[in-house]
Each structure stands twice: as C-alpha cells, then as structure tokens.
UniProtKB/Swiss-Prot annotation:
GO cellular component, one term: extracellular region
Protein's UniProt keywords contain Oxidoreductase: no
Residues of the signal peptide: 1-24
This protein's UniProt keywords: Disulfide bond, EGF-like domain, Extracellular matrix, Glycoprotein, Growth factor binding, Phosphoprotein, Repeat, Secreted, Signal
This protein's encoding gene: Ltbp4
Compositionally biased intervals (Basic and acidic residues): 521-561
Observed phenotype of the null mutant: Mice reveal significant disruption of elastic fibers in multiple tissues. They develop pulmonary septation defects, rectal prolapse, colorectal adenomas, and dilated cardiomyopathy. They survive up to six months (mid-adult age) without major clinical symptoms.
Protein name: Latent-transforming growth factor beta-binding protein 4
Methyltransferase in keyword set: no
PTM entry text: Contains hydroxylated asparagine residues.
Phosphothreonine modified-residue sites: 1564
Glycosylation sites: 351, 424, 1097, 1242, 1381
C-alpha cells in the first residue's frame, strides 16, 4: 500500500543530457535546447548520470528507493516524478593522446515520453571516440575556509528558494512543499522557458589508478539549466567499454542497452541531503567525503559514519548539512610546502625528500581490525568473522551481509508483532532503515537506535545497508591486487612477426560471477570482421589475458540484488585472433607460419614431427611441450626476497620490501635501513640503536620512549603520582618536576604549616589570633571585625550604616564604637547610642486650659472639640449614653466619638438630622393599607386592619383577603358550593333546595310532600334527590327488575372501605370481613395465609417446560428450543428458520419441535455449516492419511471436516530419552502450587507439550516444554499445537482429543468439545472460561463497567445476580431495571430521535422528518431519545435484544440470566488464526469478519479464551507463509451452541462472505440498514414493514414484527396488538389494576386502595396509614 505523499504521485519528467550531433541529420525535436560547453579530456573513459529523487526517496546505485512503495529504477533517459535523471554520455578511450576538443551538448528540459526519448537518443548518438562529460556544481559563492556546504536536496519550483533540507521559501503567489501550488487569486504563469543558470562541474575519475606522480585525471563541464533544477554529483566512475564510431551492430547493441530497465555499466553515486525527521547532527551519523577541493566536498563513502570513524580512516571531511574538514587534514593543508613542492598523499617531507607516513602509528584506524602500513597508505587486516567494508578502512561483522529474508514488522504491541510490510526482506534492511520494529518469524526485536547492537548490524548508520555484492570484491586475500586488464600486445622477441594492430587479442573485463544461480546472459552479436585478402581460421575461444605491471586496474562490476545480469555497453568491433592450443596435422613450418603466437611468450621452432617452443626468459615449456608458461620464482626455496615479500610477475618477479627495509643494488634483495643515520636523528633527547627493519631509542632518566618508538618524551611525574606534592601544585619540568606550595605551607612537599600567630607584630591587632592549617583566624572584640581567615581585625564604622544609628542626631565614629550628638528637643539615651525626643507635655503648665500634643523635637496646644472635655490635660470623648435615656424607651443608644446614635425598634424612628429619641410611626397616614375591604387602625409601633364580613387580614396584616368558605367548611351538602367576593352561594341539584341559612342543600321528601298518591299501591321510598316505589324486601335484598328481591353485594356497592384493611366477602343478605392475602396465597382456617402451589398439577406448564413453584407465584422453565408464551403458563416452539435469518444459506430450513434442520434439495448433497452451502458428501474415513472417523452430523454440534495434510514434509519428531515413557503433564508451572496442577498422569512427552501442557515429569520434577519458536519444538511438534505425528508416517498428523486425554482437568465445571486442532470449553450461563486456570469461573456481573442493575443495587450470586430497588422504585419486567410505577411509559410519548452521540455524550444530528417513540428511535433510527438525551442501550447488549426483539450478532452468546433461553452461554468458537484476540477499552481489534461488526462488550462474556495462541488475525499473509496450522485450514464460523449451527450470510442486506465484504459493504451496514438492497414494493407500501423488519424467505419476503405488533397480511405492515382486549378473563394481564393499551405494549394502573408490588403487573392492597 503506497503511503500518500505530499502532492500525490510525482509526475513523469525526462531530463536528457545528449551530445550534439555533428551531422546534418542531428536536428533536435525539442524546442531550443540550451547549449552547453563541454571540455573533453582524452585518454580516459568516463560517464555520468545524476538522479534527483522525490521526497522521501534516496538515491541508491542509480535507483530511487522509497520506503513506502516499490523500487523505481532510474535508468538512462528516464525520469519519474520529482526525480531528475541526467542521461549519461558514453565515451570511448583514445588510443593516442590528442589535444582537448570542445563541442556542444543540449540539455533538454521538456517532458518527453519514452518513445520520444528513444528517437532523440538515436538522433543524438555520440560521434567520435572521446565523447564523455563530467558534471559537478560550482557554488555561487565561496564558503569560509574549513567549512564546505552540502547542496540543498529539494527542487523548488516557481522561483522558490530551498532554505532547509525539507523546506522551500515560496514567492507570494505560490505555496506547497515545492512551491508547486498556486495560491488563491494567483493566476498560473504562462508556459515559458525558465531562467537558466550556469554551473561548473569538475571531478576526478573514481576507481582510476593514479599515475606514478599521484595526480588524478580531472575533467570540467559547463552546464546551463533552470534554477529549480539542482545537480548533485558526488562520484563519477569510469565507463566500462568504448563505443565504435560507425558500427551498425554496436549502435544496435547500444540501443538495446538504452531500452533495458537496469542501470548502465557506469554509475554515479549520488546522495540527497537527509531529512530532518530521519536523523540529525545530534544522531552522530553523517556523510564521509574522501576529497576536499577548496570549499567543496566530493567522493562520499557509501553509507553513514560518525565523525571519529570518518576522520581516522580515509575521510578528509564529514558532515550532514555542512561538511567540515577533518582536523588532521587542516594541519596538513596549512603546512608550508618545501622547495621541491608538496609530497603525494601518504608521504611527508623529511630533509627535502618525501618519506612514507606510517598511518598505523597514529592509531585509531582499521576499526575491529589490524592496521598494516603500506607505501603511501595502509591496509586493514580483518580477523575471522569480519570483512573489509567498501571504503577498505574498517572491518565490519559478517552478520551485516546475511541474506536470510523474513517478515519485517512495523508495530509492536503487548509483546507481539503486527503490521508487516508486503514482502520479506533481510534483517539489516528492516532494522537499519528504522522502518521495522522487529524481524523474522520469531519476532526478533531490532536493537535500539544508537546501541551497540545497532552499530554492529548497521555499521553504515541508519538508512544504509551492506549487500554481499558490495563486499565480495574486498574478501580477496590481502596480498592479491585487483584484477588488471591490458590492451597491449604480449611480450615476444622483436624478430617474431606480429599480427596487425586491429587483431590484437583483447578481452573486455567481465563482471565477477555471482555465487547464486543466474539466467543465461544475452548472446552478444558477433563482431563484423574487417575485409582482408586471405582466409581466416574459424574463431576459437579467446585466452585469458596476462596481467601486465603497467596495466590499468580492472573496474569492478557489482551485480544487482536481482539475479538478472547488468546490461553491457558494446565493445568496438575487434575480431578475435587466437592460436590453437592442440597441435594440428601438417608440416611444422606451416604451423609456425600460420600461427606464430602458438607458443605464447616464446618463439615457435618448427620440427620435422611438429614444432617446439623457445621460451622467453622467465618462462618454461609447458607439460605438453606446445606452449610457454610462466615460472613462479617466488616458490623457490629459499625465497629470493628475504626479508621482503616476493611477488611473481609474468616472466620475472619483484621484491616488495617491508617497513624498515629498502631495495638493494640488486632488485632481488632487501637491505635494512639504518634509521639512526638520519639527519636529524630520530631519537630526540635519547640514544638511537638500529635494529633489523627498525630502530630503538634508549632514553635517559626522566624520559621514556614515545608510543611510536621514534623519540624520547618527558615523563610527567605529576600525572603518574597525583599526590606527589601534597597540598601543593606539581609542576612538570623537562626530566624532573617541582612543587609550588600555597600560602601557609612550606617544605619540599608542602607538608609544613606556617604559624602566622607567632609573627611580630601580631597579625590580628586588637583581636586574638588562632592558628589554622595553612592560615590563621582572628577573634575580634566588639566594634571590630575580620574579613575572613587570614584577615586582621579592623574598626567597624557604625556611622556608615543605613539607617544611621543616631536617629534625629549626628553620628560620630570612635575606635571600636560611636557617639550621637543630639539637636534641640532631643537628648541622648543612657547608652548614648541614639537620640530620644524630649516630651514637653509632661510639664502640666505647658498648655493651661488646653490639650498639649507632643511632637518630635517640639509640642503644640489645642482646644477640645464638641463632644469632648479636658481630663488630666487630655481631650477625652463624652459618653452621652451613660447619662439617662437619650433614645427613649423604643431605641438603643450607641456612643460615637463626639456624639451618639439611636437604633429604633420596628415601627419607630429617630428624628432626621440630629440624634434624638425614637418616636412612633403612623403607618395609616403614610401608606394605603387595608384598602378596599378594611379600615386601618394605628397602634404603638404598628397598625391593624379591621376587615369587612367575608374577608380576613392577609398573611402580613397589611390587606384584607376574601375568605373561601367552600374550601374551609362543609357547606352546601349534596350541592355545589360556589365562592363569591366576600361570601358564597349554594347550587343545589334536582330534588334538593337551599336550607334556611342558605349554607346547605336539603333533600326534598317527595313522599311526604306529595302524599301516598305518589306511588299508588306500592310503598314510596324517599332517596337522596329523588324517590322510588318499591316492594317490601328483607334487609340485605333489593327489588329486582322483574319484581323479585335480589341480594345486595355490599362489597361492590360500598367498596373496600366497608372492611377497612380486611377483605370483604359478600354473603346472601349480608357480607363478612376476612383477613387479606396477597395474590398467590390463600387464607388458612386459622386466619393466616399460605402459598398456593400452582405446580401441584404437573401438566400446569405443558409438555415442554418444567413448573417451578415460587413464593406467591410460579415460573415455567422452558426446554431448549422453546420460549415462554405471552401468558407465561406454557412454552411454545422457537421457529429458528424465522429468527435466525438465512441460517441454512442455500439449503432449505425446516423447523422441528425444539430445533431445526438444514435440508439440501439435491440428494445426496450434505449441508456444510462452515460455508453455509450444500456440498457433495465427504470421502469416508480412512481415505486420506491422518483423517479421523467422521461423526454423524447433528443439530447440536456440527462435525468439522478433517484437516488436510500440511503443505510441506515435516521433520521427524525429536527422538531420545526425554520423549520416551509416560509421565505426568503439568500446566501453569509458574504458579506457587505448580506441583498440584496436573493435567494427566500417564501421557507422553509429545502428548503433553504439543497440547496445553507446560511441563512434563514425575514427582514434581518438572521439565519445561520447549518454546514454540525453538528448533526442539519444531522437531517435537512439526504440525503445531493440537497435532501428533503417528508412528511410522511422518507426513501424516493426528488430532489430539484433549477432552478425552485430560478428562475434566482441561475444562472444569464446563462442557468440553474437541476440535481440530484444540478444543472448546462451554461454560454455564454466568460463567466464563479462564485460560490459565483451565476452568469455568463465576462472572461478577456487578463489577462490569456497564451497570447490571439500572437505577438499583446489584448483588452478585454464583452464576447470576439479582437487583434490589429502593422504594418507591420497583423492578420492571426484565428484573434488571428499577422504575417508578407512577411514571408514564416512554413509548406513550413521541420525542426527538438523535442519530449520533459524541464521545463526550453530547447528542447531535436529530431526525427532523419525524418524531418517534423510545423503542422506534433506539431500534431503527438513532442512538439517543428525547430532550434529555436518554441513551439507547448498546446494540450488543441484552437490553437492546429485549427492547428491539432482535437476534444479536452470532459472535455473542444468548441472553444473560433473567429470561428464557439456553442454559449455557457460548462465546465465539473462533479457531486459529483468530484465537486470543486482544481487546480492551484502549484497543478494540477490527471485528472478526464477517460475523461481528461491533467491538467486544466489556467483561469476559464476549469470547472464550482459546487454549492455543496464534498471531493476531489482522496480520496480512506473507508471500511464502501459511497459517499456523497449514494454508488449507480456515477458521470455523462462530457457533451458537447446541441446536444453533450458523453460517455467514450470502444474501443482500445480511452477512456477506469474507471475500465479498469489501464489495457489498460491511456487516455493520447490514445490521444498521436492514432494508438496503430491497425494492420498495417488496416490503409493502408503508415504508417497508413499519414496527418490524423485512425478512427474505424462500417464497419472497415477509415482515418480522416487533413485540406488541402483529402482521397485517392485507397491508403487509405491523399493527399494534391491543393486549388489554385480548387478555383472557380468567387470566388478566393486570391484577388489581386497570390495563391501558399503548403503542406496541400496555401498562397497568393500580386501582384505588392498591399499590404496586415487586411482581410486574401485580398490585396488592395498600397498608392502612397509621
């Protein structure tokens, strides 16, 4: 999956750098290409290509690699996206030197197609033997010395400027990562050629051997290109072969090479600047450059290195964004060259001559290897297990070139690996790219970035790796030179005839072969021979050329990671010319004449019987006598070059002398160099002694030999002995040292303290001197102080303090003290340390008759104010409240300064403006009180209202209010009292009249007023408001309609109040009161109540249920496959074919009593519950190896098909003493009581460890089972957990029946069902399976996050729970929610339906087209209801199932306790690889498609803990991996348990097949949109089954109505059921209550005198109030 990048995919752009055609036919199709001046330097071959890669891509071997997509090649004449590939210009070497030529090339910046590029390539074919170009950018300004800039990697368009490695500074009209987007309002620029800029590129040829003077060949090119195009060339390698000028076959081969998708045989090692989010300077890794010319860095080494590793190796500069020269290079560059010029690299000038530098003596080179000095350089010798890297300056571990491939995981969670990339790669690529977090099938963690483990496998730093082809060239022996190739003629005596120059035997260097298998290379076209006059023999295989000393190094050709060989550029047409190696028949002279080179390096001598060879010096005749072979002089004993190293050469040998030796007069000997005779001598300050190959420095006392042994260096005694000078400082001297003592110490080692107190005069003056170590301390008297240790006592100037100690005075300092001089009005204190004020007011005569007020330094006189009087010379306040009652009797006096204040009582107030007594307020004069129905009367402190008749004073007494006589008195009996303003009136009914007082209604006695004539012969009986004519009946009877006397039912006529708290029973002519019993109880003869046992009649609940008597009631517990009827007194069959939609798939569903069957229409097909289709019958047991006997299919547990054999041949199981015998198998061995955790006592090692066992042994001597990732486990259990290998047949496997092997130990308190592989443990309702304890444990429903008892208190019980409510709340019908009996049902009201609830429980998106009831909203449309945002129950909860009458997703079990259903709760029986799915509040995995669209509910109900773990199901398949139990094993669909086989749906609007989930919508959409895919007319005309769901059936469709609705077949809609009318009279729905029908349900309203009980729809007599 390609990660979306900024700006989308890169557009295709081809940038071609083509040499200009010299012929007339070389016109360019591109519009006005810019000319480029190119300097062509002969005698060298080279080519160049520069790749510019898109963002998040890096160039690698002329390929742009993106971590998020597949590798895209960057071959010649191709460019993709923001990549820019400059097409290389091939060239051919010149056979002879000629002056530099200049020509023109065209740089075409127009986007071209591949066909246009190929046509342009044909027209711009390079002509001439010396055409080639090198590019290198010249920066616009010179960088400071010692700091070179790495070019900015981004290509900024539309005039943008690259300011950071990942940022472009755009002009105002453009935006985007690369300034490629037009801002709002900006118009796109007109298409035009962008401005051109010129860059100059100058670089040496890489992999080119310097000549004997050490000067590299340099080339320069001037290039004009747009400003947004950036060219970065770090290194240029030579072209492998030349081109011929006018050879059609060579042009054809070049065209074929241009069409190839692989890279050319020359490469440009280009690298882009790193991204800031990948690594930074702080990471310590950067680029290492091997060349530094001026302020520019060039020739970077592949990979990343630290600055230390780079600078101590071959690097000259290092950096990430800026490259900094190494310190050692700066020192060398700053040295002044001698008179003879600079020395070549690796040499230094000593006494006017260049001497080899021993790089190994400086240390820090050849990391992980041993440094060996060579002339002009050094080499690294790597130990076993290490290889030379591509820079040949350090050794890297062989672990970095491991080619083992495995999955690379990008996510780690809870110790598991997930989200692997789409292909298997090596561990180095996975971890060094920092894309992967773990690698391999065993989930091996990648080492942390920057750790030692990371540096071991990623020595090149992050983002780079080594391949085997990169290092294969460096694994040759140390003394072996790179392969060389010569184009010169082999040496032969001058007299021997030579073939023509064009016929010289030559061979193009071939790339090194790859060890792995490779396809056959393309056949190379035979070169066209030049015309000649005499016939030529048939060409034969060309011999291997002999290396020559002066030959050029053979360029290395590294194969690509793929097995396809690199395409080659053609060679010039040179006919092959070789001689035969086998003598031919004929005269010998003709043989020597026909083939003068038949002897090789010798002369052919004809003989009568053939010929022989006269070999050149250094060669001898071969074993067959027909060819001269080289003599290896180095194999002679003794060796000819001791003590040097002998190197054999064709026809001779040479001696390579080691360090400390030099070649003697003869080339075959090495003489010792006497280093001691050098001027100046090498041993500074010492004596030099020469040794073979080296020298030794004898140093005097105080000196020691330097680490390199070439001089004597001073011994730093101060560093060797840190405590040499004690408290002093050790100062090193040449050959010695001295101690510098601090103040207060003396002696040679500063060990003697100086007693300063003994000196004269004493150092402390007036103080006491105390000597201390190295100093002294002064104890000063008062008025003196010391500034610290070693300081004398000095006088303290108290007058300089702030504030001054002499306030109001002048301070004068004295020796050790001070004195104060006070002004007038002040006097010094007793101590004389400060000035005190003189209080003149102490003299009473100072202010006669006035108050004296003292002030600092003076005083003043003033008279007393009002309310004050003079007391003892002071003005004091007069307390008016203490004399009399100034506020009167109704006020409280409060004294104030100079006056007083009166606080008056309510109804009183003080006079305004001045203090005075409180007077009464006349409210009748100030307010409109008591009006209009009363009169105001003032009282002392208040007032009263005298109201008119029919009125009374109000609550506050300020007004008169009307009296409602009708509500306060029992007026107008038998009439209606109507209140009037100030009175009332009685409205009497017919038959009544008002009384004399007009306050009551009296009955009119018609019998008395109208006399006996009113009823004739019958008796007139007056009644309230009327009368009647009746016969005379006995008491307790009344006349009937036919003139009879009928019994009066006093209990019905007078109600329950006739008997109070007892129950009324009617009797003939009377009634009686008996004690009351609740429903379900019956009275006893003694007056008590006892329970009625409804289950005494065993057929009370019918044939499919068991009657369970309860106190005051009963319960019918239905059998499996049945559900309770509406009346609760019998059970009816569940039609699974209707409730489980599409349960049989393509088969026909047939409902049977208590279950159902899936019948296939075509015989003899069988129904497969896993696929939901009818399939041909399976093969009988025993047909295939390892198959098990097939159990007959049953509705309870569908049989699973036998697992096929694994796809690969497994290794044999581990044999040995460990697996022999039978012992005990243990589980949970980490527990403290592991010895008691025994699964079985007589099992084998394989049976225990290949199942759920963790240890095996006897007597608690437990041997741990091997880990699943170990080789021992793979050998013991080759087919994985749950399978054993039958004896004698390693290719077969046998499933282990854990339920039979471990009996009840593996599924305690549950039902164990064997599966293949593994087993399933079915726990009772209210229990869940504990995977570690291997048993069913009770689930604490009260501890779940969702409240089990809504509005009440939850009490957990074993296997269940019950809810209690606080009065006046009662339990509803579900027994799981507390409701108020007086509250109105939610479904009686219509409200707004909210379609979405946010994470903060805020309702949004209301349904605006209609309002809905609570049930309609939650079941059909939304997530919350009403203005209070009442949340709907979760769709995977029991409440939702009960509310909406829906079948939950099959991945969940049946309803929890509290209703009718199956007595076992089943979790999803998910087999591998879907077992052990992690879930929780922070991590919900995607649903197990196609079964469950919702995250698992909280608590352990949602799933069964599988005994065998497996990787998470969301991991994509690997290219070469199967599942954990074989590729052909698929997970079983979830099972609903006994009688409920299930398959994934394949109909529209239902559960799609796994492969159809992405095309037909998710399972969530199938549940939330049940009408999707159905036509409108298929579900009727009323919006498709209102109050129900549209269900497909084989005959078409039908409506499945919700509870409380029934199907009206005429309208195909669900109509409300009136439960109140359809209830049977003998079994009413509401007991002691009135039934009220609602939409889809009903509710009960208790009758007067009755209250609701804990039983639903039951009301009991209310208790009388005390």
């Amino acid at each position: 999956m390609r990660r979306p990048g900024l700006g989308g995919p890169c557009p295709l752009l081809l940038l071609l750098l083509l040499p200009a055609a010299t012929s007339a036919s070389g016109s360019s199709p591109s519009p006005s290409p810019s000319p480029i001046e190119k300097a062509v330097v002969p005698s060298h071959q080279a080519g160049v290509a520069a790749c510019h890669c898109c963002l998040d891509q890096t160039p690698k071997s002329s390929r742009c690699t993106r971590a998020s997509c597949r590798v895209r090649n960057c071959p010649p004449a191709k460019c993709t996206g923001l990549e820019g590939c400059l097409t290389p210009t091939p060239s051919v070497p010149s056979p002879s030197r000629s002056p530099v030529e200049k020509s023109q090339v065209s740089l075409n910046w127009q986007p071209l197609t591949l066909q246009e590029a190929r046509a342009l390539l044909r027209q711009r074919r390079p002509r001439g033997p010396w055409a080639r170009a090198l590019l290198k950018r010249r920066p616009p300004h010179r960088a400071p010395a010692g700091q070179a800039r790495v070019l900015c990697p981004l290509i900024c368009h539309n005039g943008g400027v690259c300011v950071k490695p990942d940022r472009c500074l755009c002009p105002p009209d453009f935006a985007g990562k690369f300034c490629q987007l037009h801002s709002s309002g900006a118009r796109p620029p007109a298409p035009a050629m962008p401005g051109l800029t010129r860059s100059v590129y100058t670089m040496p040829l890489a992999n080119h051997r310097d000549d004997e003077h050490g000067v590299a060949s340099m080339v320069s090119v001037h290039v004009e290109h747009p400003q947004e195009a950036s060219v970065v060339v770090h290194q240029v390698e030579r072209v492998s072969g030349p081109w011929e000028e006018a050879n059609p076959e060579a042009l054809a081969r070049a065209e074929a090479a241009a069409r190839a998708e692989a890279a050319a045989p020359y490469t440009v090692l280009a690298q882009s600047a790193p991204r800031e989010d990948g690594y930074s300077d702080a990471s310590g890794f950067g680029y290492c450059f091997r060349e530094l010319r001026g302020s520019e860095c060039a020739s970077p080494l592949p990979g990343l290195r630290t600055q230390e590793v780079c600078c101590r190796g071959e690097g000259l500069a290092w950096g990430v964004h800026d490259c900094h020269p190494c310190a050692e290079h700066l020192r060398n560059s700053n040295q002044v060259s001698g008179p003879n010029g600079p020395c070549p690299p690796g040499f230094e000038r000593v006494n006017g001559s260049c001497v080899d530098v021993d790089e190994c003596a400086t240390g820090g080179r050849c990391q992980h290897g041993e440094c060996a000095n060579t002339r002009g350089g050094y080499t690294c010798v790597c130990p076993d297990g290490f290889l030379l890297d591509s820079s040949r300056s350090s050794c890297i571990s062989q672990h970095v070139i491991s080619e083992a491939k495995g999955p690379c995981y990008r996510v780690l969670h809870d110790g598991g690996c997930s989200l692997p990339i789409l292909r298997n790669i090596t561990k180095q690529i996975c971890c060094c790219s920092r894309v992967g977090k773990a690698w391999g099938r065993g989930c091996q963690l990648c080492p942390p970035y920057g750790s030692e483990g990371f540096r071991e496998i990623c020595p090149a730093g992050p983002g780079y790796h080594y391949s085997a082809s990169d290092l294969r060239y460096n694994t040759r022996p140390l003394n072996q030179d790179p392969p060389r190739v010569t184009f010169n003629q082999p040496r032969v005596p001058p007299a021997t005839p030579r073939p023509p120059t064009g016929f010289l035997p030559t061979r193009r260097p071939e790339p090194r072969p790859d060890p792995g298998p490779q396809p056959e290379p393309r056949p190379r076209p035979e070169p066209r021979p030049r015309p000649e006059s005499r016939p030529r023999p048939e060409p034969r295989p060309r011999p291997e050329p002999r290396p020559q000393p002066e030959s050029q190094p053979r360029p290395e050709s590294r194969p690509r990671p793929e097995s396809q060989p690199w395409p080659e550029f053609p060679l010039p047409s040179i006919p092959a010319w070789t001689g035969p190696e086998i003598p031919e028949s004929g005269p010998s002279s003709s043989m020597c004449q026909r083939n003068p080179q038949v002897c090789g390096p010798g002369r052919c001598v004809p003989r009568p019987s053939g010929y022989t060879c006269a070999c050149d010096p250094g060669f001898r005749l071969g074993p067959q006598g027909t060819r001269c072979i080289d003599i290896d002089e180095c194999r002679r004993v003794p060796t000819p070059c001791a003590p040097g190293r002998c190197e054999n050469t064709p026809g001779s040998f040479r001696c390579v002398c080691g360090t400390g030796f030099q070649a003697g007069p003869r080339a075959t000997e090495c003489l010792d160099v006497d280093e001691c005779r050098r001027v100046p001598p090498p041993c500074d300050r010492g004596r030099c002694e020469n040794t073979p190959g080296s020298f030794l420095c004898v140093c005097p006392a105080g000196y020691q030999a330097a680490p390199h042994g070439a001089s004597c260096q001073d011994v730093d005694e101060c560093t060797q002995s840190p405590g040499l000078c004690g408290r002093g400082v050790c100062e090193n001297l040449p050959g010695s040292f001295r101690c510098v003592c601090p103040a207060g110490f003396r002696g040679s080692a500063c060990e003697e303290d100086v007693d300063e107190c003994a000196q004269q005069p004493p150092p402390c003056g007036p103080g006491r001197c105390d000597n201390t170590a190295g100093s002294f301390h002064c104890a000063c008297p008062a008025g003196f102080r010391s500034r610290g240790p070693g300081a004398p006592c000095q006088d303290v100037d108290e007058c300089s303090r702030s504030p001054s100690p002499c306030a109001y005075g002048r301070c004068e300092n004295t020796e050790g003290s001070f004195k104060c001089v006070c002004p007038t009005g002040f006097q010094p204190n007793a101590a004389g340390s400060e000035c005190e004020d003189v209080d003149e007011c102490e003299n009473r005569l100072a202010c006669p008759g006035q108050e004296c007020v003292n002030s600092p330094g003076s005083f003043q006189c003033r008279a007393c104010p009002v309310g004050h009087h003079l007391h003892r010379g002071r003005c004091t306040d007069v307390d008016e409240c203490s004399s009399g009652t100034p506020c009167g009797l109704h006020g409280q006096c409060t004294n104030t300064k100079g006056s007083f204040h009166c606080s008056c009582s309510t109804g009183y107030r003080a006079p305004s403006g001045q203090p005075g007594p409180c007077a009464d307020i006349n409210e009748c004069l100030e307010g409109d009180f008591c009006f209009p129905h009363g009169e105001c009367l003032n009282t002392d402190g208040s007032f009263t209202c005298t109201c008119a008749p029919g009125y009374r004073p109000g609550p506050r007494g300020a007004s008169c209010l009307d009296v409602d006589e009708c509500s306060e008195e029992d007026l107008c009996q038998s009439g209606i009292c109507t209140n009037t303003d100030g009175s009332f009136e009685c409205i009497c009914p017919p038959g009544h009249r008002a009384g004399p007082d007009l306050a009551s209604c009296l009955d009119i006695d018609e019998c008395r007023e109208r006399g006996p004539a009113l009823c004739g012969s019958q008796r007139c009986e007056n009644s309230p408001g009327s009368y009647r004519c009746v016969r005379d009946c006995d008491p307790g009877y009344h006349p009937g309609p036919e003139g009879t006397c009928d019994d009066i039912d006093e209990c019905r006529e007078y109600g329950s109040a006739i008997c109070g708290a007892q129950r009324c029973e009617n009797t003939p002519g009377s009634y009686r009161c008996t004690p009351a019993c609740d429903p379900g109880y019956q009275p006893t003869p003694g007056g008590g109540c006892q329970d009625v046992d409804e289950c005494r009649n065993r057929s009370f609940c019918g044939a499919h249920a068991m009657c369970q008597n309860l106190p005051g009631s009963f319960q019918c517990v239905c059998d499996q496959g049945y559900e309770g009827a509406r009346d609760g007194r019998h059970c009816v069959d569940v039609n699974e074919c209707e409730t489980l939609q599409g349960v049989c798939g393509s088969a026909l569903c047939e409902n049977v009593e208590g279950s159902f069957l899936c019948v296939c229409p075509n015989s003899p097909e069988e129904f497969d519950p896993m696929t939901g289709r009818c399939v041909p019958p399976r093969a009988p047991a025993g047909t295939f190896p390892g198959s098990q006997p097939q159990a007959p299919a049953s509705p309870s547990l569908p049989a699973r098909p036998p697992a096929p054999p694994p796809p690969r041949r497994p290794s044999p199981p581990r044999q040995g003493p460990v697996s022999s015998g039978r012992r005990e198998c243990y589980f949970d061995t980490a527990a403290p009581d592991a010895c008691d955790n025994i699964l079985a006592r007589n099992v084998t090692w394989q049976e225990c460890c290949c199942t759920v066992g963790e240890g095996w042994g006897s007597g608690c001597r437990i041997q741990q089972c091997p880990g699943t990732e170990t080789a021992e486990y793979q050998s013991l259990c080759p087919h994985g957990r749950g399978y054993l290998v039958p004896s004698g047949d390693l290719s077969a496997r046998r499933d282990v029946d854990e339920c039979q092997l471990f009996q009840d130990q593996v599924c305690k308190s549950g039902v164990c069902v064997n599966t293949a592989p593994g087993y399933s443990c079915y726990c009772s309702n209210g229990f869940y399976y504990h995977a570690h304890r291997l048993e069913c444990v009770d689930n604490d429903e009260c501890a779940d996050e969702e409240p089990a008892c809504e509005g009440g208190r939850c009490v957990n019980t074993v296997g269940s729970y019950h809810c209690t409510c606080e009065p006046p709340l009662v339990l509803d019908g579900s027994r799981r929610r507390c409701v108020s009996n007086e509250s109105q049902s939610l479904d009686d009201n219509l409200g707004v339906c909210w379609q979405e609830v946010g994470p903060d429980l805020v309702c949004s998106r209301p349904r605006l087209d209609r309002q809905a009831t609570y049930t309609e909203c939650c079941c059909l449309y939304g997530e919350a209801w009403g203005m209070d945002c009442a949340l709907c129950p979760a769709q995977d909860s029991d409440d939702f199932e009960a509310l909406c009458n829906v079948l939950r997703p099959p991945a969940y079990g049946p309803p929890r306790p509290g209703g009718f259903g199956i007595p076992y709760e089943y979790g999803p029986d998910i087999g591998p690889p879907y077992q052990s799915l992690p879930y929780g509040p922070d991590l919900y995995p995607p649903p197990v498609l196609p079964y469950d669209p919702y995250p698992p509910p909280p608590g352990p109900f949602a799933r069964r803990e599988a005994p065998y773990g497996a990787p998470p199901f969301d991991m994509p398949d690997f290219e070469d991996d199967g599942g954990p139990y074989g590729e052909s094993e698929t997970p079983d669909p979830p099972s609903r348990g006994t009688g409920w086989p299930y398959r994934s749906r394949d109909t529209r609007g239902s559960f799609p097949e796994p492969e159809e989930s992405s095309e037909r919508g998710s399972y969530t959409g199938a549940l939330s949109e049940p009408y999707e895919g159905l036509e409108a007319e298929e579900c009727g005309i009323l919006d498709g089954c209102p109050h129900g769901r549209c269900v497909r059936v084989p005959e078409g469709f039908t409506c499945d109505c919700f509870d409380g609705y029934r199907l009206d077949i005429t309208r195909m809609s669900c109509v409300d059921v009136n439960e109140c009318d359809e209830a049977e009279a003998t079994s009413p729905l509401c007991v002691n209550a009135r039934c009220v029908n609602t939409d889809g349900s009903f509710r009960c309203i208790c009758r007067p005198g009755f209250a609701p009980t804990h039983q639903p729809h039951h009301c009991a007599p209310a208790r009388p109030r005390a």
